[in-house]
Amino acid sequence: MQFSDPATVLIITILAVTIAFTAVSLYTAFGPPSKQLADPFEEHED
């Protein structure tokens, strides 16, 4: 498999960006930064 093929480089780049975005999203949602997230339903007064 050659990595010099433009299509292969594009696919690997798209996969890397997608995996990185998913990892950061999961870390933000469930990791230590999730304590800083506000819940709008709990803050809303009826």
Swiss-Prot record:
Bilayer topology annotation: Single-pass membrane protein
GO CC annotations, alphabetized: plasma membrane-derived thylakoid membrane
GO terms for biological process, alphabetical: photosynthesis
One family name in Pfam for this protein: PsbN
Coiled coil: none
Cellular compartments annotated: Cellular thylakoid membrane
TM stretches of this protein: 10-30
InterPro entries the record matches: PSII_PsbN (IPR003398)
Keywords: Membrane, Thylakoid, Transmembrane, Transmembrane helix
Role of this protein: May play a role in photosystem I and II biogenesis.
Family: Belongs to the PsbN family.
Stored HAMAP family: PSII_PsbN
Name of protein: Protein PsbN
Lineage summary: Bacteria, Bacillati, Cyanobacteriota, Cyanophyceae, Acaryochloridales
